[in-house]
A protein has these predicted regions:
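N-proximal, solvent-exposed amphipathic alpha-helical segments enriched in charged/polar residues
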Residues: 2-35
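C-terminal boundary of histidine-terminating zinc-finger modules
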Residues: 337-350
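Residue-level signature of catalytic and energy-coupling elements of molecular machines
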Residues: 16, 34, 55, 69, ...
Length: 378
């Protein structure tokens, strides 16, 4: 005769170990978020700590906890009660996440970091740099990689809108910022800290401080890839990124238009002055396929190849054209709705072309141990 399984506290904790805090990406059991476990016969009641009152992930955490507990063999009624951490508990959590670090540091500046960092740049605005950043990041996240985005375009921030996370502000735990996650991508932007569409009116030093905070004060976890969406041109932010994250590689975005390509070269030649590597060139808004199958080159053709060839000569290195992204209305449409085209319409021409570029970016970088971390601006 079969005996009924008696649920134990160990069973409950093992189940809860499958529940992650969505903002931190670690099991709630490892984060000391399980407040209590009470078992009465076959009924199970658990208490779970949230990092802050009004936690935006409360429904997700509660639902996931309830789901794993209801899968327990022989379980009866399941109840989940939510509590809020005290200031002392939040400090302990922040200390645990920082590990041996006594204060904020930029993990991506560590010579042993394995995170591949891409600074996405363009000579001028309007070439689709931010759209490329968001879709490349989302494409890699869809393949199972851990990906983040820093919206370093402080004045022209657009990442929250393109990711559909305008209404998701970051959670702050003892001065450590937990970035929102959308489509599997952690991302941070100054747009998450301002009211509505208010402009940012800052001078250079404030820009530098913002980038430092995004890199050091945000909990990124163990990222495979970090994208930094730079502002157009070669100003303060581009230099700041080169100095704070010297192993960042430049991804140059241009259009086929000759004038845009010429300006894009300037964004690429900053690599000579900062000793950065150029990962490649992306040509956006390439030919548009018409209903009859013909291709209309609305913005001309050859701009991407021109930039790649010219930068190869100027930097004495092999700078490849990683891909040409066709002019596809779906790319714009899904950008407006915050649903990147690579996941919302994966079979569209633009999505396929972007994934082909993403496939060339997903390898973790080599360690910079023993190499100079002080790029000079010549």
């Amino acid at each position: 005769m079969a005996t009924e399984h008696t649920i134990t506290e160990a069973d409950v904790l093992a189940a809860l170990a499958r529940v992650e805090d969505p903002e931190i990406g670690k099991p709630i059991t490892e984060l000391d978020m399980v407040e209590s476990v009470r078992i009465t016969g076959a009924d199970v009641a658990v208490g779970i700590y949230l990092t802050i009152a009004g936690c935006p992930m409360r429904d997700t955490i509660e639902g996931n906890a309830r789901a794993v507990l209801e899968e327990l063999d022989g379980v009866g009624e399941v109840s989940v009660a939510l509590h809020t951490m005290s200031d002392e508990q939040r400090r302990a959590l922040a200390l645990k996440l920082r590990g041996e670090q006594t204060g904020p540091v930029i993990p991506f500046a560590d010579p042993d970091t394995r995170t591949r960092i891409y600074a996405v740049a363009s000579g001028k605005g309007g070439v689709g740099k931010s759209s490329m950043t968001v879709n490349l990041a989302t494409a890699l996240a869809a393949q199972g990689l851990t990906v983040g985005i820093v919206d370093a375009d402080i004045y022209g921030h657009s990442v929250p809108g393109l990711m559909g996370s305008d209404d998701k502000g970051p959670t702050v735990v003892d001065e450590m910022i937990m970035p929102p996650i959308a489509h599997g991508v952690r991302h941070i932007s100054v747009g998450q800290f301002v009211e509505g569409n208010a402009p940012i009116v800052w001078r250079g030093p404030m820009l530098t401080r913002a980038i430092q905070q995004f890199l050091a004060d945000v909990y990124w976890g163990d990222l495979d890839v970090l994208f930094m969406d730079l502002p157009p041109g070669t100003g303060d932010v581009a230099i700041t990124v080169a100095q704070l994250v010297p192993n960042a590689e430049l991804l140059i975005v241009t259009t086929p238009q000759a004038a845009a390509a010429e300006v894009a070269e300037r964004a690429g030649t900053i690599a000579q002055q900062t000793d950065q590597k150029i990962a490649g060139v992306i040509e956006n808004m390439s030919g548009m396929t018409m209903p009859d199958g013909t291709v209309m080159n609305i913005f001309g053709e050859g701009g991407g190849e021109q930039v790649a060839e010219r930068l190869t000569q100027l930097t004495d290195s092999d700078v490849a054209l990683l891909g040409s992204i066709p002019l596809d209305p779906t790319l714009r449409e899904h950008g407006d709705t915050g649903t990147p085209v690579v996941i919302s319409e994966p079979d569209s021409p633009a999505a396929k072309a972007i994934r082909a570029v993403a496939d060339q970016l997903k390898v973790r970088r080599e360690s910079l141990a023993g190499k100079s971390l002080n790029p000079r601006v010549k």
